[in-house]
């Protein structure tokens, strides 16, 4: 489980340009941000996510509660967390303790967020939903993100991101 931030300003990824020329990109003039909390369910191959206006303890606790209520209690839920400050807050530790009988929390080493498998999906999401595009308002970005998230949870869609179930 992890969170990512999506912004209104354009992100340029793999763009053709003539040598010596830099592409000029229009921008809306001000940055606005939106946050997505997400967890990948290895059993169902689906992404459980929640949009949030703020990336803080309250949003994190709300997502953990939503996550734990959306999965069956047959097996423990493995939660992989990085060292964001709000993951270590008193309220965050309280909600993780509340669900400790149904979950196993693994803390990543500091500055090693790339070890979290969902980071690969966040890169895919940003490439497909908002790279090389100009959005006038943050609602357009959110709509684009929602469409890619919907594709991800459609198991028959050929454009979805597929996780490798084996590691070398």
Give the residues covered by each predicted segment.
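Short beta-strand segments
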Residues: 1-2, 77-85, 107-109, 162-163
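RNase H-like polynucleotidyl transferase catalytic core
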Residues: 22-29, 97-117, 133
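RNase H-like DDE/DDD metal-dependent nuclease/strand-transfer catalytic core used by mobile genetic elements
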Residues: 59-104
């Amino acid at each position: 489980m992890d969170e990512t931030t999506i912004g209104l300003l354009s992100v340029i990824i793999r763009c053709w340009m003539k040598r010596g020329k830099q592409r000029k990109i229009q921008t809306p003039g001000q940055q606005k941000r939106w946050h997505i909390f997400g967890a990948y369910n290895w059993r169902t191959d689906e992404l459980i996510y929640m949009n949030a206006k703020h990336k803080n303890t309250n949003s994190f606790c709300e997502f953990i509660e939503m996550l734990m209520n959306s999965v069956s209690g047959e097996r423990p839920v493995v939660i992989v967390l990085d060292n964001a400050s709000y993951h270590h807050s008193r309220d965050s530790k309280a909600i993780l303790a509340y669900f400790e009988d149904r979950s196993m929390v693994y803390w990543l080493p500091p500055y090693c967020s790339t070890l979290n498998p969902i980071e690969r999906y966040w890169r895919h999401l940003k490439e497909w939903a908002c790279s090389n595009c100009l959005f006038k308002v943050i609602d357009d970005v959110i709509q684009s993100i929602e469409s890619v998230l919907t594709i991800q949870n459609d198991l028959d869609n050929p454009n979805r991101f597929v996780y490798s179930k084996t590691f070398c």
